[in-house]
Amino acid sequence: MTREQYIRMTETTRRVTDRLPGRAKALRAPTLLCAAIYCASLLCLMFTGDRRIIRAVIVPAVCFAVVTVLRPLIGKQRPYDRYGVPPVGAYKPGKGKSMPSRHTASAAAIACAIAYVFPHPAVIVCMALLCAVIGSLRVLSGQHDISDVLAALALSLVISLVGNRL
């Protein structure tokens, strides 16, 4: 993505989100919804004594840990640092930890954990859509490049597939 494309994309996103009451909350809403669904799912598993709770906790935690370790090793700059243009929403400049996207990786790992526990097609589709919204917002808000989000998705899917098959 070029600087001009980045500016055009974030300005378009900014114009749309400026119309929303509580823009910062609106941008965080899908992530908070994903976390709430995950917590509710874990509570259901806990109260029913379902042993799948172990994988539903461990696999996303491993994914989160792997992504957290990889980010400084890769050291890719975020688009807003690279182009010198602030993103939409809150941000911390100069950290150089863009790839892979931790929000997207976590959302994908949570979606896979919930699909593992509740393998109904409607649940799987809803979680996949929520994950896609979270990843898309990371790009459209200027927090990440598409490659950051795709790397996070791929990594989460591999870790989840391996973790849920062992």
At which residue positions do the language-model features occur?
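N-terminal transmembrane-helix/juxtamembrane module of multi-pass inner/ER membrane proteins
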Residues: M1-C39, R51-I54, V67-G96
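Hydrophobic alpha-helical transmembrane segments
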Residues: T31-L42, V62, C126-L129, I134
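Membrane-embedded catalytic cores of phosphoryl/pyrophosphoryl-handling enzymes
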Residues: G84-L166
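Alpha-helical transmembrane segments of integral membrane proteins
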Residues: C44, R51-V59, V123-C126, S147-A151
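Transmembrane alpha-helical segments that form the membrane-embedded catalytic/substrate-channel core
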Residues: A65-L73, V133-V139
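Alpha-helical transmembrane segments in multi-pass membrane proteins
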Residues: R55, V59-C63, V67, A152, ...
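Short helix-capping/hinge motifs at transmembrane helix termini and TM-loop junctions
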Residues: F47-G49, I74-G75, P119, G142
